[in-house]
């Protein structure tokens, strides 16, 4: 998981208004927001007050709306992509109205380009393989990695790194072909990946496995070595500065030494397994964390040391997302 630069929390959500379903997003939308999305086993939920209260996202009357299990949420503001049962849903008005794009298989991950104004590429990971759209979802190429579940996607460029049912695979040609999974990584599903912020020059990545803990590669996925949490299911990884966070059945785990040692951050989590993590202010701040569990959303305001409930009690939450923060405004230098 990698995130963009953040700014101080607060302010308003401003936009020029809704745009067409496939219209190009505004060049510089201002998004400083209190909105959090949560994908549950039975649809999409939204909080407009930083997890204080939640509402079901219904869409316009008679229109499409997210339903079924929502496993992936990717807001890029005002556009929001959601991966549901057998469809990708797209909103161009911050989640108020939606259109549905049918795809084969259950959708596990959705990843648009980091530069949507210039590049309309959209990748979709499903239980049936990897789909690529050159036009923001109007059409999809024939799937690659056919028959292989693709659960997570990272695209630092030029490499496309995917977590699959066969391990971690890497493509250098936009998903046309893949290499991997490399040596040293146990067979079976990889559920999470976290990449160096400077992956082109520093190709370090971590993989969270379904039953064997965390593994680390220093060479872009060619070779792997164990990085702790042996025997544990790792559903999410977030690498933030010196800290590596893992979502596990034992709660949230954190390492300060690239996986050599780990500490458990579970005070207040009531023993709940954690499936996903969201750091809405990263990388400027790692203090605020939201955690998706099988009994709702939890929130920490101190980097995971203490947790408290943040709504959707009793609901199995599978994914979390929020709008990326705006780029900082830079003044002109005097003189």
Question: What positions do the PLM features span?
Answer:
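Extracellular glycan-interacting surfaces
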Residues: 2-335
């Amino acid at each position: 998981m990698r995130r963009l630069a953040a700014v101080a929390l607060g302010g308003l959500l401003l936009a020029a208004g809704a745009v067409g379903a496939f219209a190009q997003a505004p060049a510089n939308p201002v998004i400083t927001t209190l909105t959090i999305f949560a994908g549950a086993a039975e649809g999409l939920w939204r909080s407009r007050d930083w997890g204080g209260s939640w509402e079901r996202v219904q869409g316009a009357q008679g229109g499409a709306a997210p339903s079924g299990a929502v496993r992936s949420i990717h807001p890029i503001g005002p556009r929001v992509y959601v991966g549901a049962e057998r469809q990708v849903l797209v909103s161009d008005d911050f989640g108020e109205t939606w259109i549905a794009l049918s795809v084969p298989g259950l959708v596990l991950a959705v990843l648009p380009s980091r530069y949507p104004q210039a590049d309309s590429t959209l990748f979709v990971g499903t239980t049936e393989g990897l789909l690529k759209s050159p036009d923001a979802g109007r059409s999809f190429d024939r799937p690659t990695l056919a028959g292989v579940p693709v659960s997570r996607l990272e695209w630092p460029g030029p490499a496309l790194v995917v977590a699959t049912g066969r391990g971690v695979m890497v493509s250098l040609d936009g998903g046309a072909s893949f290499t991997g999974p490399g040596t040293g990584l146990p067979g079976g599903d990889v559920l999470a990946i976290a990449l160096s912020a400077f992956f082109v020059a520093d190709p370090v990545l971590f993989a969270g496995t379904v039953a064997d803990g965390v593994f680390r590669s220093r060479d872009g996925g060619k070779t792997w070595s164990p990085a702790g949490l042996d025997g544990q299911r790792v559903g999410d990884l977030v690498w933030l500065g010196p800290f590596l966070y893992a979502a596990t059945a034992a709660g949230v785990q954190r390492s300060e030494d690239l996986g050599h040692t780990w500490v458990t951050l579970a005070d207040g989590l009531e023993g709940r397994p954690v499936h996903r993590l969201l750091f809405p202010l990263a990388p400027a701040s790692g203090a605020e964390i939201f955690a998706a569990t099988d009994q709702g959303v939890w929130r920490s305001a101190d980097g995971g040391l203490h947790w408290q409930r943040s709504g959707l009690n009793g609901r199995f939450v599978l994914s979390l997302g929020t709008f990326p923060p705006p780029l900082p405004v830079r003044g002109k230098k005097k003189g």
